[in-house]
Structure formats: structure tokens, C-alpha cells
């Protein structure tokens, strides 16, 4: 990842390379990426995800929140974290299409709750 980043052609986002706070520290220390994408399920929940997000912000690392086909309730938790840490950025918040739910509404690429 670092070699691609240093080539300077593209910004590099760490996604599957970051599962926890130690992974985030390593990526930041190595300057291996420009962004870290946090997923609540992958990181062990909201508390650890928030710790990763705060480390990224304190280190000047861009951070976004993604989802892994969570239920609508999981996406709502991810939405709250995304709004808390970087409301101006694009995040990847999608629920599985097979969940029949009125908890989330997607309009023009934006997710909201009723």
C-alpha cells in the first residue's frame, strides 16, 4: 500500500487492513495510506470504532465509516459515528437489500432515518 501511496497517483484507503486500534496506529506510523475506512462490525463495535476514529483525527489521517451489509440498526449506529467524526465526507453506509425495514431511507445517494 505504501508504495502505491508514494507513487502519488491515487489516494490510498485502508479498509481490510484495519481491524483495530493497533492496525490503525501501524498504518499511520508507516504512512501507508491517506484514508482509513472504519467498519463497526469489523472493528468490534462502536467503542473501538470511535477510538480508531479519534486516533485518525488526532493524527491528521482522513477517516470514513463504512458498512458490511449490517442490519438497518447497524447502519444507524454507523451513521451516528460518521456524522460525529466527519459529517462533510462521503461514507459507505448501506444495509442489506433483503432487510425489510422502514428505518432507513435512501434518496439521491443520501441515507436518512424517518
Outline where the language-model segments fall.
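Flexible C-terminal active-site loop/helix
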Residues: 68-114
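Glycine-enriched alpha-helix->loop->beta-strand junction motifs that scaffold or abut catalytic
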Residues: 3-12, 28-37, 55-62, 82-89
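A polyampholytic, Gly/Pro-enriched intrinsically disordered region
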Residues: 34-40, 110-114
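A cross-family glycoside hydrolase active-site/sugar-binding cleft signature
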Residues: 13-16, 39, 64-66, 92
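Active-site-adjacent beta->alpha loops and helix N-cap segments on the catalytic face
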Residues: 1-6, 21-24, 44-55, 74
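Active-site-proximal loop/turn and secondary-structure-junction residues that shape catalytic pockets
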Residues: 18-20, 40-44, 69-71, 97
